[in-house]
Amino acid sequence: MSSHTRTQRLSVPQLVAMKGRQKIVSLTAYTSHMARLMDPFVDFILIGDSTAMVGYGRTSTLDMSLAEIIAHTRAVVAGSRLACVIADMPFGSYQESPQQAYRNCAEVMARTGCAALKLEGGRALAPTVEFLVQRGIPVMAHIGLMPQFVNQMGGFKAQGLDSEAARKIEEDARAHLEAGAFSLLLEGVAEPLARRISDFSPMPTIGIGASPACDGQVLVTEDLLGLGGPQVPRFVKQYADAGALISQACERFAAEVREQAFPQLQHCYGVVQEA
């Protein structure tokens, strides 16, 4: 279903039904303004815990609170009208137990109006996914390169490059599908592995640094716009240099203020215009 033909917000079942029919498009957002701009063109908007890095300048996604996710998700829901809205659950908000996960996931959904939640974890997380799904919370399972496991993985490294690592990720995928996840997000995994998972999965796979064979693709919007900083992941394609445009606009503003070219009377209130 093309976003250009929709008149209502895309639902999770409609997103699932796109598998095998149309590629799914997603970008990240954490403000209402950005959500409004991308809304006509994407199928779902992801409020990623990557906001900790691209929005707040932190060194990892681990330093993202539940309150921050709720605030940013509320903004994205308010700024969008057509796209399905999916929020990341932050580190430490769901790993302790299925009960903890349900309390926090239910709070995010109730307070924001988002349609689903994304959780990172391998097959050990599958019982939690099943617990949530059985209680009405749609879950997108994030496997492969999992930024919340950055300390355990030793950095942001591609996953599934050897047969044993690939086998474990494939087992993660099957466990989450059996648990009832409506989608799999595959990040930074070997292309043949992502292709294989996409082939056997009855649910949509969303790739980021994975494979063209995935049912959909997502990117961090700041990377797409050239705002992600000097170190850009290999899987990113930059579609615009918004950073240069912003710098140019700031430079022009500063120059005009210092040269007393701005503001002019036309920018002021209560000015009597000469006849």
Curated annotation (Swiss-Prot):
Could you tell me which pathway this protein works in?
Answer: Cofactor biosynthesis; (R)-pantothenate biosynthesis; (R)-pantoate from 3-methyl-2-oxobutanoate: step 1/2
List cystine links: none
The note describing how and how many cofactors are bound reads:
Binds 1 Mg(2+) ion per subunit.
Q: Which reaction does it catalyse?
A: 3-methyl-2-oxobutanoate + (6R)-5,10-methylene-5,6,7,8-tetrahydrofolate + H2O = 2-dehydropantoate + (6S)-5,6,7,8-tetrahydrofolate
Location relative to the cell:
Cytoplasm
EC number, UniProt record:
2.1.2.11
What CDD domains does the record tag this protein with? Answer: KPHMT-like
Residues holding 3-methyl-2-oxobutanoate = 49-50, 88, 118
Question: Where does the protein principally reside?
Answer: cytoplasm
Q: Name one GO biological process term.
A: pantothenate biosynthetic process
What is the required cofactor set for this protein? Answer: Mg(2+)
Q: Which residues are listed for Mg(2+) binding in this entry?
A: 49, 88, 120
- Record-level GO cellular component terms: cytoplasm
Key word NAD present: no
List the Gene Ontology MF annotations in alphabetical order: 3-methyl-2-oxobutanoate hydroxymethyltransferase activity; magnesium ion binding
Q: Which of UniProt's keywords are assigned here?
A: Cytoplasm, Magnesium, Metal-binding, Pantothenate biosynthesis, Transferase
The record's annotation in SUPFAM superfamilies points to: Phosphoenolpyruvate/pyruvate domain
What InterPro entries does this protein's entry cite? Pantoate_hydroxy_MeTrfase, Pyrv/PenolPyrv_kinase-like_dom, Pyrv_kinase-like_dom_sf
Catalytic residues, per the record, are 187
Q: List the HAMAP family.
A: PanB
Q: Quaternary structure?
A: Homodecamer; pentamer of dimers.
- What family does the database annotate? Belongs to the PanB family.
- Annotated function: Catalyzes the reversible reaction in which hydroxymethyl group from 5,10-methylenetetrahydrofolate is transferred onto alpha-ketoisovalerate to form ketopantoate.
Protein's UniProt name: 3-methyl-2-oxobutanoate hydroxymethyltransferase 1
Annotated gene:
panB1
